[in-house]
Amino acid sequence: MSLRVAVVGSGPAGSSAAETLVKAGIETYLFERKLDNAKPCGGAIPLCMVDEFDLPPSIIDRRVRKMKMISPSNIEVNIGSTLKDDEYIGMCRREVMDGFMRDRAAKLGAKLINGTVYALDLPKSSNQPYTLHYTEHREDGLVGDNKSLQVDLVIGADGANSRVAKAIDAGDYNYAIAFQERIRLPEDKMAYYEDLAEMYVGNDVSPDFYAWVFPKYDHVAVGTGTMRVNQAKIKQLQAGIRARAAKRLEGGEIIKVEAHPIPEHPRPRRVVGRVALVGDAAGTVTKSSGEGIYFAAKSARMCAETIVEFSNGGQRIPTEDELKIYLKRWDKQYGMTYKVLDLLQTVFYRSDATREAFVEMCSDIDVQKLTFDSYLYKTVVPANPLVQMKITAKTVGSLIRGHALAPTRSW
């Protein structure tokens, strides 16, 4: 037999899965409903992703080597002095990166289908196929015919609003709302953001997350995020970041407005039968940072590698238990990272006082090195005991001082 796999969604997750599968000689169908889609996203990727996923310099708009953390009382902390000359955070436009990764998978042999999957029929037995029903889109932009495809396995890489997840009753998760404006700045203003990104914290920009100004190709992405319970306030919070960064954004022109949900924890069920969820569909976005691009691509690759392994290179159909090994490996490798970032958000994002403490703590060189090493290389890097004791003591001191620094506001 020859294994047939459908990958629904061609962002970093779907394209990574498709590439891994097709390299192993597995018949792979890659679905994308909108080939020119520009997903709302800060667009930051860690250094390890560039090498690990063989990303060319052409898709990286900016190499950020400096960060500013800006507290509720507008105290600024500069971060980046611990970076080596060849270290940076890559800033990308999702439409550029996604297009590159999707095209690469297609050139390697994945069958790219420009269509919207609207239903998934589940098999009644373990040896029957899954049937995907989809509407094909034509090159002229018009809706084409309704079609169907039968496959042995399905990978759901179709984002936070995953239809694949709904089809297998994967369960819901809490999510945040990200709102972002792309703003083209005058040349002198854009020069300020040449290799600099900014993160703002405070109740005025988000009661439970942060706001950002990230540089892109010829503009900046200015946005904020908040949990869905505060969704009605999102435009008020966006006005908050625009006000805080007003001088630096002066003369800017809004060229695009975007909004998108961000998962806040994994779905209750990520593998059901012979269907596996990856990326945002699975809920791999980290708390505290809201980062999802690397973890989306990595989860998808690990899922696809598991399929290759247990299908003997496409010669048999893996079982549900075999697919779940991908989750065990994922949780073993990254479980601690998620726990640490969850704790960080719980401790430091709960009030303006704790946010003041967080920004102050970021001024410490040991904290900066620990944070950047963990971000750039995607590991929770343990500090030596003396450094850890020092960081703990500074954290306590910062929390105490933060209560004195926090601005008094009524909302």
Which residue stretches match the model-derived regions?
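Glycine-rich FAD pyrophosphate-binding loop
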Residues: 10, 22-41
